[in-house]
Amino acid sequence: RSSRLSSHAGQVSFPGGGIDAGEDAQQAALREGHEEVRLEPASVRVAAQFPELPVAPSFRPVTPVVGWWREPHPIGVGSEIEVASVHTVPVDELVDPAHRFTARLPGFDRTTPGFAVDGLFVWGYTGWLLSTVLQLGGVDRPWDTDDVREVPPDYR
């Protein structure tokens, strides 16, 4: 996310945003993917929709839509106001135990799954969602949940 945003600035996230009039969550996810990272909606097969869940600190409701990018094509920053950079990370890197840890925001007791991939520190809701999708997809590997790392200032 762009450092110019008012919430979750500088954090790693998936494309997303509000649902426009006449859209459902899946249509909104595909539209936002196109607007933010130039993902062609026709290249994605929606695989699942998670239940709505409020995300701290704003507690805005988020409905994750998970898809299979069946026809990869070049993507990149589509909205410089919202997106600082775009990264694609192979599943093999995400499940590598060397890239997994437990993330903790200083001053808070709550932790989330974390990932150190492609020079990024992934944590919070995005870390939880990635970890959940890897588990549900049956590709998760055991990792050291006792390896607790503080969220760096640039990712808070």
Go through each PLM region and give its residues.
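N-terminal strand-loop-strand
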Residues: R1-F14
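Gly/Ser/Thr-rich helix-start
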Residues: Q11, G17-G18, Y125
